[in-house]
């Protein structure tokens, strides 16, 4: 079973990219579980056809310790298994702590057991890993491969670099490695070349360039992944290609984070600062 965490700047399209990629893997016959690690609890919506799922923390709050696995895991597109850790009430408690509670709960209830025949577990993780709780999949060896969703925008690249610092910090203890950057295009000038160069300097690869297409939004409005909504569309093939590249990937590295000056030089070299 491969354990993968998807990180990236808030709003970059992690949940969308994760769910569309999972749909691609499911179509290939892979058995996948998705663990949403975001208080917004939107990491599985498209796989479940828009069904709002009761989160692990909500279930715990309402039912106490008496929780069954089927209370917190729902079956989604292509027999994917979907669960959301959820978060504390706004303004109370720590969302990162909630993720730790949820993942421990899933382990205790046997969500990762061999009987499910899982090929993949995906953790879709909030934001920029500035807080220890959100770093938990990296820190405690829950995830072994990290993919960072990035674009050619300054803050997305800055966040990706920060995440690499987190991976570097825990690489020895948790055995976690960076599998590559996924460029979720924002149609920035020279975007593909810039992210390829960023990947090179970090010592990794740009595993796939996902072009910007309104079909993604159209599918989302219909509460589906692109592969589910319009399987013949070119954008569906992009996600299939990404799924295949992740399935075939053998490049796992400890990244070499850039200094802020190097990052700014990269932006200037590719003309974004002009």
UniProtKB/Swiss-Prot annotation:
* Cofactor binding, per record: Binds 1 [4Fe-4S] cluster per dimer.
Listed CDD domains:
NifH (cd02040)
Record PTM = The reversible ADP-ribosylation of Arg-97 inactivates the nitrogenase reductase and regulates nitrogenase activity.
Q: Does Cytoplasm count among this protein's keywords?
A: no
Query: Which cofactors are required for activity?
Result: [4Fe-4S] cluster
Which residue windows are transmembrane per the record?
Answer: none
GO BP: nitrogen fixation
Q: What protein name does the entry list?
A: Nitrogenase iron protein
The organism of origin for this protein: Chlorobium phaeobacteroides (strain BS1)
